[in-house]
């Protein structure tokens, strides 16, 4: 039946005429000569069928009989790739006026069918121009498998895109007269809309240059392409709707040689996947024939994210799940309608992963049991305690040297305005014991090493901003819940007052664990700790709690330089909130060459006494510092002018006699003048400073509390 449908009148009429001529020749051969008797079985000449007689048509073989144009047995060719998608082919010869040909009634041999037609013209009979059929057929593996060429750009949801300007090239002159307009009954087949796009109005303003494809014509176009152009023009003139206009202009369903919307006449079949002008054969176009707004393949282009970055505390994987998907789930859409591909600039996931690693490393600091070697220690901890503490005459006990913690934890998650990944900032070499006012998040019970308690905080705590009417008993009652304590303030014994005179006091706890409990109960605001205290007239007034972290007493800036007491200065009147790291930064900014800074603390309570020391790595910086005599300390809320003196030791021998004249005793005097800068015993000082120009030098002696002072020298 399919072979019957593929035959055309143009092929059957010459066959019928040839058979009629053969019958006439046979009749002439069988006709008797004049005067002979006629055989009874020979038909008369009057009974010979005429070509014009309609009775000759049934006499033909069933294989050569064409179907009636408008008969009841008329069938329509369906697509072998898409069932239900029919084609209509206007005949190449003009039909009689009384019998208009319906679309799809017959198909010409030039129509490229995937079925064998038995013809010998491979170019005209192939479904796609330029591919030779195999045994009258064409292999389907020649087509891309991931995109069906049935759905061309005209069948996409953007079917209403204007593409008229790409068909301005006039078709070659047709050898046959143009077809008349299609009858009205053929239009309903073109009125079908895509269910995905009920209206094409929003896409009417899109330029056809962005989505259309210029047809590539061959040097020898077939006659069927001319018929297609003529039929398209006729259909465009008779169409009334916008859909009909786009359909007829694109000739998607009315062109006999171009029945598929994604193909043009004479085009290389491998370019049927939406190849633009200038694109090589076999290269997929960046436009998808299903939808021009989408790409048919996964893109490797990294798109900038459209949506704001997620919260930094949201735990998720580094890479998106669909970063390397091969289907259309990772398409790059112009408006980012789908989840974006992997963005290398999207660093919030990496930061979360690093924070999780740091949080895991810091778990031992949150109340867990420590190994026998002690808690983790930073490199600055070990560097200072193992390399420099002995030279300064300071004895520290250092547990945890076997368990080194590389990252500083003193301000992890506590200090506002800093990155949790880089907590060092100005204290980049500070150890891991925590900030004095920022340690509540890292507080833990007192560390123990072989049964020996290791303290983290001074047992003396500053409390500021107290209510003016609060007395000693009320202060004690407010903080007694943390442990036994004594309330003190400056000149308390002499004042004989029960109220702190300046609104601040000191809490002297009996146990260091009480200080840690107090820190845990405080609230943090802008890097400071507060606790609510009530008085007879004021209820729940926030007061500032300022503990002193023992690790803030010393800071090593340059561990490669040895500490020389002859290059160390004494800084008096240092504000108590100032830490060693801040003192080192100020001095290094002023004079340079700072390798160590320390805060003098009380030997019993280990609370700052208001003085500090700074060691330099070179003589020039040391002389510049002591020559200035005064320096302005400015840091945050601190702005104070302090005095600078040479740091005097009490265990130095005389630099002149090396103890020979004083019986091996330590030198009691130190000359701070830049022309001397030496230790002298009494005999050597008298002999050296009796010379001209040195009689006005004043000696420095070390008094209690490591504070040097000038003393008058008594001449004998």
UniProtKB/Swiss-Prot annotation:
Pro residues bias: start-end ranges: 91-100, 169-186
Entry keyword annotation includes Cytoplasm: yes
Cell compartment(s), UniProt: Cytoplasm; Nucleus; Synapse; Cell projection, Dendrite
Bias-annotated ranges (Polar residues): 107-118
Domain characteristics, as noted in the entry: The N-terminal Gln-rich region is required for the formation of amyloid-like oligomers and for the stability of long-term potentiation and spatial memory.
Function text: Sequence-specific RNA-binding protein which acts as a translational repressor in the basal unstimulated state but, following neuronal stimulation, acts as a translational activator. In contrast to CPEB1, does not bind to the cytoplasmic polyadenylation element (CPE), a uridine-rich sequence element within the mRNA 3'-UTR, but binds to a U-rich loop within a stem-loop structure. Required for the consolidation and maintenance of hippocampal-based long term memory. In the basal state, binds to the mRNA 3'-UTR of the glutamate receptors GRIA1 and GRIA2 and negatively regulates their translation.
GO cellular component, one term: glutamatergic synapse
Residues recorded with modification Phosphoserine: 194, 197, 291, 419-420
Domain of life: Eukaryota
Post-translational note: Activated by NEURL1-mediated monoubiquitination, resulting in the growth of new dendritic spines and increased levels of GRIA1 and GRIA2. NEURL1-mediated monoubiquitination facilitates synaptic plasticity and hippocampal-dependent memory storage. Under basal unstimulated conditions when CPEB3 is mainly unaggregated, sumoylated and acts as a translational repressor. Following neuronal stimulation, becomes desumoylated and aggregated which is required for the translation of mRNA targets and for dendritic filopodia formation.
Family: Belongs to the RRM CPEB family.
Annotated site residues (Cleavage) in this chain: 459-460
Summary of subunit composition and partner proteins: Following synaptic activity, aggregates to form amyloid-like oligomers. Aggregation requires an intact actin cytoskeleton. Interacts with STAT5B; this inhibits STAT5B-mediated transcriptional activation. Interacts with E3 ubiquitin-protein ligase NEURL1; this leads to monoubiquitination and activation of CPEB3. Interacts with CAPN2; this leads to cleavage of CPEB3. Interacts (via C-terminal RNA-binding region) with TOB1; TOB1 also binds CNOT7/CAF1 and recruits it to CPEB3 to form a ternary complex. Interacts with SUMO-conjugating enzyme UBC9.
Pfam families the UniProt entry points to: CEBP_ZZ, RRM_7
Protein name per its UniProtKB record: Cytoplasmic polyadenylation element-binding protein 3
UniProt region (Disordered), positions on chain: 1-118, 162-209
Annotated tissue distribution: Highly expressed in brain (at protein level). In brain, expressed in the hippocampus, granule cells and interneurons of the cerebellum, and mitral cells of the olfactory bulb (at protein level). Detected in the spinal cord and in peripheral dorsal root ganglia (at protein level). In the retina, strongly expressed in the retinal ganglion layer and, to a lesser extent, in the inner margin of the inner nuclear layer with expression also detected in the inner and outer plexiform layers (at protein level).
Annotated keywords: Activator, Amyloid, Cell projection, Cytoplasm, Methylation, Nucleus, Phosphoprotein, Repeat, Repressor, RNA-binding, Synapse, Translation regulation, Ubl conjugation
Family annotation (InterPro entries): CEBP_ZZ (IPR032296), CEBP_ZZ_sf (IPR038446), CPEB (IPR034819), Nucleotide-bd_a/b_plait_sf (IPR012677), RBD_domain_sf (IPR035979), RRM_dom (IPR000504)
Low complexity: bias regions: 13-31, 54-63, 187-209
Family annotation (PANTHER family): CYTOPLASMIC POLYADENYLATION ELEMENT BINDING PROTEIN CPEB, CYTOPLASMIC POLYADENYLATION ELEMENT-BINDING PROTEIN 3
Gene name of the record: Cpeb3
Compositional bias ranges of the Basic and acidic residues kind: 1-11
């Amino acid at each position: 039946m399919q072979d019957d449908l593929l035959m055309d009148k143009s092929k059957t009429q010459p066959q019928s005429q040839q058979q009629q001529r053969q019958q006439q020749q046979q009749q002439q051969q069988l006709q008797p000569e004049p005067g002979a008797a006629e055989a009874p079985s020979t038909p008369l000449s009057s009974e010979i069928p005429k070509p014009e007689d309609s009775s000759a048509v049934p006499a033909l073989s069933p294989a050569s009989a064409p179907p009636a144009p408008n008969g009841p047995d008329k069938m329509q060719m369906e697509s072998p790739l898409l069932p239900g998608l029919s084609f209509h082919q206007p005949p190449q010869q003009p039909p009689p006026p009384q019998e208009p040909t319906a679309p799809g009634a017959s198909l010409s041999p030039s129509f490229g069918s995937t079925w064998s037609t038995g013809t010998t013209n491979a170019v005209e009979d192939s479904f796609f121009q330029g591919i030779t059929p195999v045994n009258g057929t064409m292999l389907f593996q020649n087509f891309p498998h991931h995109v069906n060429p049935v759905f061309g750009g005209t069948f996409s949801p953007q079917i209403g895109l204007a593409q008229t300007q790409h068909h301005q090239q006039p078709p070659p002159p047709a050898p046959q007269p143009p077809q008349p307009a299609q009858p009205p009954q053929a239009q309903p087949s073109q009125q079908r809309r895509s269910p995905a796009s009920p209206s094409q109005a929003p896409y009417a303003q899109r330029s056809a240059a962005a989505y259309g494809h210029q047809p590539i014509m061959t040097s020898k176009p077939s006659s069927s392409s001319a018929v297609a152009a003529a039929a398209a023009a006729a259909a465009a003139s008779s169409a009334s709707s916008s859909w009909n206009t786009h359909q007829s202009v694109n000739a998607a369903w009315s062109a006999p040689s171009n029945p598929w919307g994604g193909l043009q006449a004479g085009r290389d079949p491998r370019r049927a996947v939406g190849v633009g002008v200038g694109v090589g054969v076999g290269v997929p176009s960046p436009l998808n024939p299903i939808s021009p707004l989408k790409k048919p393949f996964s893109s490797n282009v990294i798109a900038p994210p459209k949506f704001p970055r997620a919260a930094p505390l949201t735990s998720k994987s580094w890479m998106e799940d669909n970063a390397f998907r091969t289907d259309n789930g990772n398409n790059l859409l112009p408006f980012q309608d789908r989840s974006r591909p992997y963005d290398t600039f999207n660093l919030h996931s990496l930061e979360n992963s690093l924070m999780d690693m740091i949080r895991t490393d810091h778990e031992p600091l949150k109340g867990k049991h420590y190994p026998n070697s002690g808690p983790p220690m930073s490199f600055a901890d070990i560097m200072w305690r193992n390399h420099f503490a002995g030279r300064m005459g300071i004895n520290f006990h250092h547990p945890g040297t076997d368990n080194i913690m590389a990252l500083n934890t003193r301000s992890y998650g506590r200090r506002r305005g800093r990155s949790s990944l880089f907590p060092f900032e100005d204290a980049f070499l500070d150890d891991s014991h925590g900030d004095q006012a920022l340690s509540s998040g890292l507080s833990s019970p007192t560390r123990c090493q072989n049964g020996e308690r290791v303290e983290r905080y001074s047992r003396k705590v500053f409390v500021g901003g107290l209510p003016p009417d609060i007395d000693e008993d009320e202060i004690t009652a407010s903080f007694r819940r943390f442990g036994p304590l004594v309330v003190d303030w400056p000149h308390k014994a002499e004042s004989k007052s029960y109220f702190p005179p300046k609104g601040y006091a000191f809490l002297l706890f009996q146990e260091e664990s009480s200080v840690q409990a107090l820190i845990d109960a405080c609230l943090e605001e802008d890097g400071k700790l507060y606790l609510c205290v009530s008085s007879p007239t004021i209820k729940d007034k926030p007061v500032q709690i300022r503990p002193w972290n023992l690790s803030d007493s010393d800071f090593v800036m340059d561990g490669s330089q040895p500490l020389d007491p002859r290059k160390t200065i004494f800084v008096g009147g240092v504000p108590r909130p100032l830490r060693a790291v801040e003192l080192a930064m100020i001095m290094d900014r002023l004079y340079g060459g700072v390798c160590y800074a320390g805060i003098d603390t009380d030997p019993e309570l280990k609370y700052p006494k208001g003085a500090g020391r700074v060691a330099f790595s070179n003589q020039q910086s040391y002389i510049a510092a002591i020559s200035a005599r005064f320096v302005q300390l400015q840091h945050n809320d601190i702005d104070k002018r302090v005095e600078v003196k040479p740091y005097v030791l009490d265990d130095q021998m005389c630099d002149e006699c090396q103890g020979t004249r004083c019986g091996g005793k330590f030198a009691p005097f130190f000359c701070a003048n830049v022309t001397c800068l030496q230790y002298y015993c009494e005999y050597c000082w008298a002999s050296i400073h009796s010379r001209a120009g040195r009689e006005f030098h004043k000696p420095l002696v070390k008094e209690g509390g490591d504070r040097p002072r000038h003393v008058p020298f008594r001449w004998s």
